[in-house]
Swiss-Prot record:
GO terms assigned for molecular function: ATP binding; metal ion binding; protein-exporting ATPase activity
Places the protein is found: Cell inner membrane; Cytoplasm
InterPro entries per record: Helicase_ATP-bd (IPR014001), P-loop_NTPase (IPR027417), SEC_C_motif (IPR004027), SecA (IPR000185), SecA_CS (IPR020937), SecA_DEAD (IPR011115), SecA_motor_DEAD (IPR014018), SecA_preprotein_X-link_dom (IPR011130)
Ranges of Basic and acidic residues composition bias in the record: 907-917
Family: Belongs to the SecA family.
Cofactor binding annotation: May bind 1 zinc ion per subunit.
Protein name according to UniProt: Protein translocase subunit SecA
Documented EC number(s): 7.4.2.8
Keyword Metal-binding (UniProt): yes
Residues that coordinate or bind ATP: Q87, G105, E106, G107, K108, T109, D524
Gene: secA
UniProt keywords, alphabetically: ATP-binding, Cell inner membrane, Cell membrane, Cytoplasm, Membrane, Metal-binding, Nucleotide-binding, Protein transport, Translocase, Translocation, Transport, Zinc
Catalytic EC class: translocase
């Protein structure tokens, strides 16, 4: 209460910050007449002038006022658009590295040009991040006109570009692209072998559009480049047949936590099924040999109980395609990890794709935290302000609208059942359709959108494709005649190709659009329809310029007429019934776009995004949610008390309860879910930071190695450290020679480097110490390497050293990632032993990293000591190293190795292999027993160095 009084008296911190910007806005406005008087050439020359001032010692902050005035004038001359004062404030917030919350239709795309231009003057590259390729291309082409006018270059990064195209795009002053492409390019760059092959040139400043979607909704989704493992599709199909044979009493499902676990009875039943199928090793399901089987059983159980077709995923073209729970879009190329996707494929009886091994990964949280300065834009960020600050140190600033919002957000209507709710939605749609008010009905999933479509179809409505000109003409004709056409369109992941058309025409009089969350972001819905879309469609075949101009004028008049129809589509509703002689009390509800929500989402932001499609730039509009106690949010998060209360109130079938208290109760439920999800993301980030710190060390090492012309000093240090480790393992410090493990040392030297070094003879010498042994071994190794340099030449050996070092580092890093994944899956069990899983994970991960470093020294030393160069048939320059060309969608690894190999590579009969002479073994399968006779698999013995 005191806080509310203080805010009223002094204003909120947001109000004070906006007020502080006003002085700079006034200064920019004061410059406008002088800047407007400049010629095009003089305006363009200001860019060079600003850069010169920066070089002379001025800061970007010093240049903000004249730079913003310059961009505003360039926008007027190129696009015919002038930045409003509130847009200038938005640009200042972005430049300061914070989040500008701007409502729908307030021109976020134009706002970004201010901060982009100012920061691009530094010459370090500015990245603008969008949610899809369409928006990246659209915004780069559209806003690129401003930058080009001012002498700056614009690039765009979309899927399908080759390396050279990406390099050119990143070399531009301002680069537009999607969050996925930026992240994957970073990972791909850190799998290359030459600096000149890398695409990105640093992480100076990024502006993230729809920042809440990318930095919060997708924060838990890691970007993974992967390669296929062995095919185990039959195993997945076998496991899948067991799940339908379980009863509901055989497992417990927790929908709140999205988890499922077998009961005692379920375990016994699964054990019996596995034993009968010959898939159970040992006596018990939980024997150590069955760890993998238990994992696959759990994933199959999750696939059947927690994941719903047409809600969490769809099946298309023999594939399981994930549906983004926040946007409703198909996530082509994305796959669930840890065998879950394969379990879903087995469940749906489509082709089970092989599991993949992680080659490189990063989360959006860690990728975007690499930028020196990060900023964001969205229409809905205030509800997540705490998370933005805690994780990214970004403050949310609510930018005032240029025109006051005229949308009416009504209280929710709550029904007992979904059937009653759908009947109420149908009645409301019919009322709106009769007065030609366009309606957008928001749903939470594909399944729900199709249920609503079925309700409309059964009531005499017809589904059409808004991309079909003939179907649209029926809608236009009905609007001109003032009659409802009873036509509707569905926008969900199944019809994503029609998205642009559906959104463009959703504001036409009488239009009914049923949409998933796909309609929540991106293109604005304009009242009366989209002028650009209609001109594009209706004048494409007209070649005569005069005829085309006349048609465009007709379209403009048509759309203005439609706009007025929509604006006047007001509704009069009864708010108090008639009593005796007293007439009923009514109230007017505004026209404009009518948003109907068919259920609340877990996040308030998603609901606010849906409401935000209406009421753009001061247009009237209306929004209302229709709910039932059977909705997911109400059902999972405790509708029992509410149901009891409604029963006591004597609520009849078909009646709804409407009260602000209901809205507050729902908001509290949503806040609880948001807080829980925030805690999950925060906890996951703590674990991911452990891997991220190691990733930075490895990637920084790679960059340093790639910068060096020669890594001879590095590999020499690694070789000497390896020898020290080997000697300390077999020779106790200050011990007598009789106490040395000479046989073990000799055997390991032979196994690792293939040299018969007379350490047994040295050990017999009088007075020899461990330090002397170390010096002699280093000398033998160094002389062996010097002989190879003499044989092949220093240039070839320097190339071989660098190639082998980088490739071995990459190989061991991949294996290390797998180890970390496995560790992370089981570390939670340490909590039962009263130990902190996070601290345990940090400690274990550090130990694994130390082991990987030791393996790297050993493997690089072993390979360089054994390396043989295969000369080309004709003398030629050494070719550049091929790079990993990883497709993030397929996970295919097209890496080609350099012209350096270990010889020999031909297959040799097992009987001809000498266990003591590795050079006689030829090519050995990784899963074969090692020919040395150790009893280990080749990949875990000598194969570690192959």
């Amino acid at each position: 209460m005191i806080g509310a009084f203080a805010r009223k008296l002094f204003g909120s911190s947001n109000d004070r910050r906006i007020k502080a910007y006003q002085a700079r806005v006034a200064a920019i406005n004061a410059l406008e007449p002088d800047v407007a008087a400049l010629s095009d050439e003089a305006l363009r020359a200001r860019t060079d002038q600003f850069r010169a001032e920066l070089a002379a010692g001025k800061t970007l902050d010093d240049l903000l006022i004249p730079a913003f005035a310059t961009v505003r004038e360039a926008a007027k001359r190129t696009l015919g658009q002038r930045h409003f004062d509130v847009q200038l404030i938005g640009g200042m917030v972005l430049h300061e590295g914070d989040i500008a919350e701007m409502k729908t239709g307030e021109g976020k795309t134009l706002v970004a040009t201010l901060a982009c231009y100012l920061n691009a003057l530094a010459g370090k590259g500015v990245h603008v991040v969008t949610v899809n390729d369409y928006l990246a291309s659209r915004d780069a082409g559209w806003m690129g006109q401003i930058y080009a006018f001012l002498g700056m270059s614009t690039g765009v990064i979309v899927h399908g570009l080759d390396d050279s195209q990406r390099q050119k795009a990143y070399a531009c002053d301002i680069t537009y692209g999607t969050n996925n492409e930026y992240g994957f390019d970073y990972l791909r760059d850190n799998m290359k072998y030459r600096l000149e092959d890398m695409a990105q040139r640093g992480h100076f400043f990024a502006i993230v559009d729809e920042v809440d979607s990318i930095l919060i909704d997708e924060a838990r989704t890691p970007l993974i480049i992967s390669g296929p493992l062995d095919d185990r599709s039959e195993f997945y199909n076998t496991i899948d047949t067991f799940i339908p044979r379980l009863d509901k009493s055989d497992y417990d499902v927790d929908e709140k936590q999205r988890s499922v676990a077998l009961t005692e009875a379920g375990m016994e039943k699964i054990e019996t099924l596995l034993r009968d199928a010959g898939q159970l090793k040992g006596e018990s399901l939980y024997d150590i040999e069955n760890v993998s089987v238990v994992h696959h059983i759990n994933q199959a159980l999750r696939a059947h109980t927690l994941f719903q077709r047409d809600k969490d995923y769809i099946v298309r073209n023999d594939e399981v395609v994930i549906i983004d729970e926040f946007t409703g879009r198909m996530m082509q190329g994305r796959r669930y990890s840890e065998g879950l996707h394969q379990a879903l494929e087995a469940k749906e009886h489509v082709t089970v794709q092989p599991e993949n091994q992680t080659l490189a990964s990063i989360t959006f949280q860690n990728y975007f935290r690499m930028y020196g300065k990060l900023a964001g834009m969205t229409g809905t960020a205030a509800t997540e302000a705490d998370e933005f600050y805690d994780i990214y140190k970004l403050e949310v600033v609510e930018i005032p609208t240029n025109v006051t919002i005229a949308r009416l957000d009504e209280d929710d209507e709550v029904y007992r059942t979904q059937t009653e709710k759908y009947a109420a939605i149908l009645a409301e749609v019919e009322r709106a359709n009769k007065r030609l008010q366009p309606v957008l009905v928001g749903t939470a999933s594909i399944e729900k959108s199709e249920v609503l479509a079925d309700v409309l179809l059964k009531s005499g409505y017809k589904q059409i494709d808004f991309g079909d000109p003939k179907a649209l003409e029926k809608l236009y004709a009905a609007a001109r005649a003032g009659k409802p056409a009873k036509l509707f369109a569905v926008l969900n992941a199944r019809f994503h190709e029609q998205e642009a058309y559906i959104v463009a025409e959703a504001g036409v009089p009488g239009a009914i659009t049923i949409a998933t969350n796909m309609a929540g972001r991106g293109t604005d819905i304009k009242l009366g329809g989209s002028l650009e879309m209609r001109i594009q469609q209706e004048t494409a075949d007209i070649t005569d310029e005069a005829e085309k101009a006349a048609r465009i004028e007709q379209i403009k008049a048509d759309i203005e007429r439609f706009r007025q129809i929509v604006l006047n589509a007001e509704d009069e509703v009864e708010i108090e019934p008639a009593k005796g002689n007293k007439p009923a009390k009514t109230a007017k509800r505004p026209g404009g776009l009518y948003i109907i929500g068919s259920e609340r989402h877990e996040s308030r932001r998603i609901d606010n995004q849906l409401r935000g499609r209406s009421g753009r730039q001061g247009d009237p509009g209306r929004s209302k949610f229709f709910l039932s106690l059977e909705d997911d949010l109400m059902r999972i998060f405790g509708s029992g008390k509410l149901d009891t209360m409604l029963t006591r109130l004597g609520l009849k079938e078909g009646e709804a309860i409407i009260h602000p208290w209901i809205n507050k109760a729902l908001e509290k439920a949503q806040q609880k879910v948001e807080a829980r999800n925030f805690d999950i993301r925060k906890n996951l980030l703590k674990f991911d930071d452990v891997q991220n710190d190691q990733r930075k060390v490895i990637f920084d090492q790679r960059i340093e190695l790639m910068k060096e012309d020669s890594v001879v000093e590095t590999v020499t240090d690694m070789r000497h450290t390896f020898i020290e480790d080997l000697v300390s393992k077999h020779v106790p410090e200050h011990a007598y020679a009789e106490q040395w493990d000479v046989a073990g040392l000799k055997e390991e030297l032979n196994r690792v480097v293939g040299l018969d070094i007379p350490v047994d003879e040295w050990a017999k010498e009088e007075g020899i110490a461990d330090e002397e042994l170390l010096v002699r071994l280093e000398k033998v190794f160094d002389e062996h390497m010097a002989a190879k340099v003499a044989q092949w030449g220093p240039d070839v050996m320097r190339y071989a050293e660098k190639s082998i070092l980088l490739q071995t580092l990459d190989h061991l890093w991949r294996e290390h990632l797998v180890m970390l994944d496995h560790l992370r899956q089981v570390i939670g069990l340490r909590g039962y032993g009263q130990r902190d899983p996070l601290q345990e994970y940090k400690s274990e991960a550090f130990n694994l990293f130390q082991e990987m470093s030791a393996h790297l020294r050993e493997a690089v030393t072993a390979q360089l000591m054994r390396v043989e160069i295969i000369p080309p048939e004709q003398p030629r320059e050494l070719p550049p190293m091929e790079v990993h060309k990883m497709d993030p969608n397929t996970g295919e690894d097209e890496m080609q190795f350099a012209n350096v190999s270990l010889a020999p590579a031909d297959t040799v009969e097992k009987s001809e292999r000498d266990p003591n002479r590795p050079e006689s073994w030829g090519k050995v399968g990784r899963n074969e027993d090692c020919p040395c006779g150790s009893g280990k698999k080749y990949k875990h013995c000598h194969g570690r160095y192959a």
